Amino acid sequence: MDDKFWEKINTYGENGEFDKIVREIKKLPEDKLDIEIINVLGRSYMNLGDYENALDTYLSYIGKDKEDVTNADIWLYSECGWLCNEVGDYEHGLKYLQEAEKLGRDDEWLNTEIGQCLGRLERYEEAKKRLEKSLKLIEADEEENGHDRVDEKLFICSELGNLYGV
């Protein structure tokens, strides 16, 4: 897409005019859609509180990215899982997160999301293992990159504390 399109989209976003973003993107022919546009469209739906259309937007693009379908699909499944978890649909959230994992994602964020989801599904032992794995991944990253990730560790520890308190 050209600079003029993105300037318009960014201005709408800065002004909180997410309905206008949706209208602009919906005008585009399907062959102009890419992962960046799908991301903006999905986020706009979320900002409007229209979670069903956000989810449908992400799911409709799975397998369609022209440049890097695997990484796009990993991101889309991750986003679908996060979205479902945010609205309390933990079964579907877990399913989508596991799809991202099957495609090769195995980082602290994914393991934390899966751990939270499992905890809310009362699968406590599995949840603890995932969250403990997240902590190990963060600690390895800290050693490798020399920066402290205290906030993330505190969040995960609080989730673990909730699970151990059950």
Place the predicted regions along the sequence by residue.
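Short coil turns that delineate tetratricopeptide repeat
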Residues: K32-L33, K66, N71, R105, ...
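Start-of-helix register in tetratricopeptide repeats
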Residues: D3, E36, N71-W75, W109, ...
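Register position in tetratricopeptide repeats
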Residues: E14, N47, L83-E86, R120, ...
